[in-house]
Amino acid sequence: MKLGFSYIGLIWLIMLFVPNFIWMKNKPKGYEEHVKKENKVLLAFERVGQFIVTPAALIFANFNIHKITFWSAVLLISFICMVIYEIFWIRYFRSEKTMKDFYRNMFGIAVPGASLPVVAFFLLGIYGGNIIMILGAIILGIGHIGIHIAHRNEAWGKKPKKKLPVRIILGILKAVVILLLVVVFGFFIYAITGRNINEVKRAFEFKEGINEELYVPLKNGDGFVRLIGKDQNNPVILSLHGGPGEPAGYAEYLCFDGLTDEYTIAIWDESGCGRSYYRNKEKGNTMLPTPQSQQEDIDSLVDYLRGRFNQDKVVILGHSYGTVLGSIYISAHPEKVTAFISIGQVVSFKNFASEHYAYEDALAQAKAKGDDTTELEKVYKAFCDDPNVVSMQPLRQATSRYHQETVPQAFTYADLVCSPYLGVDDVRWTLFEYSMMLGNTAFEASQGELLADLMGFDINERYKSYEVPVMYISGSADWTCPWTMVKEYYESIEAPKKAMYVMEGCGHVPQNQLPDDLNSAVKQFLKSA
């Protein structure tokens, strides 16, 4: 929820109030007699709803028009409701102004003068992700629509009963429609409520620090960055996500909030993906990322963070593919780096080395247990015949049976859905990313040279010493980047200070399983570094 003037809310209120002011002198004959019979409970709901909806429409800037997205359709439907509402009034003012004229259906919509604005403001709440408006519209609807349904029945009388078979069919159809609406809007209300609660909590939690989203001009385009910390004087950690092309910045706060009391975390959607991708696409920048451009953009971002927070150096934290970017960067620019935290270090993806490594271990375990290895060998052969990201997925699924994680995820899908940072572009990119599993090659193409470069990466051939302290964190059940390979590499390198922390029972993303343990280990290492 973002406080600020809403011109959309003002327009909606004008469309609501103007015809009502005109109506005050053009009420249906005998209307006041019906008012005396209004249910006091429904009237109370109506007044409370009006009290909530009217100011809320004006003071939340989220209702204003953003860029064109899925949510724009929700705003459009809301506007259409208000337009039909105006047509309703025109029809009424041109009629004889009887109770029946006032309560005549429009386009099959019952009590349109009451239901249309309620639906419009409810949808405005969905569009703006604002639970205050949503609840206000629901309360208003209970009272306002309830009152006017009673008036309509008084004006028109009860409808004659339809035949039993017709009533049954219509009843079933209504039940199905109502159930669908409850499920769909129930989901949105749940997500928006959780999101709003988290937004308010974090506004208070970080009021003395920073909780900001922005686009930073980098060497090769704009980069989306989220800055989170409780004191802007704290050292800075730049987080490099995995992939390539797999940002999850909307969820990283769940993993790294434990660092924000001592560090400011900069979470970046790397060049060519996520919000950074959509921002540059909108500006006509269709440049595909390359290993060189990634490093240039990291350097630009590091310089921005150093300048903004008055720091000589920053900590680089990388996960999975981010450890490739981080290893390269700290080797090229040690003068700008305090330390390197590597989570799930990529040692060698050359010729998919880690996948072969994981397969051999799974095959050995399967044979030792006397399991049928036919399917395992089949998917491995398919992978070897055409090694790529798509054919890798069935292989990982088959080998995972023998590489079970014993530590559960610390977060649920509900936590992700209720993230205060989840945006439309995050959902768009995630769907685009997962379309790869269905054989869509567009995602791979969007990553330019990065995937090909990763497939030729072997850190043993590049870096045997570092000029900055380095810490390697791996899950003991990580077979995407096997911890034993990381340990062998760790033991072979030289650095001013080095440490390795194996998280027992965790997989490739230990920060999602034991975030508190991981953050404590990181803090301890950085203090000693």
Where are each of the predicted segments found?
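The serine-hydrolase catalytic nucleophile loop
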Residues: 247-256
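Conserved alpha/beta-hydrolase
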Residues: 260-279
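Conserved acidic catalytic loop of the alpha/beta-hydrolase fold
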Residues: 293-313
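Conserved hydrolase catalytic core segment
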Residues: 311-354
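A catalytic-pocket lid/entrance helix-loop region that shapes and gates access to the active site
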Residues: 337-385
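Alpha/beta-hydrolase
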Residues: 366-461, 468
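Short beta-strand/loop motif that positions the catalytic acidic residue
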Residues: 466, 472-474, 478
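Catalytic histidine-centered segment of alpha/beta-hydrolase-like enzymes
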Residues: 506-515
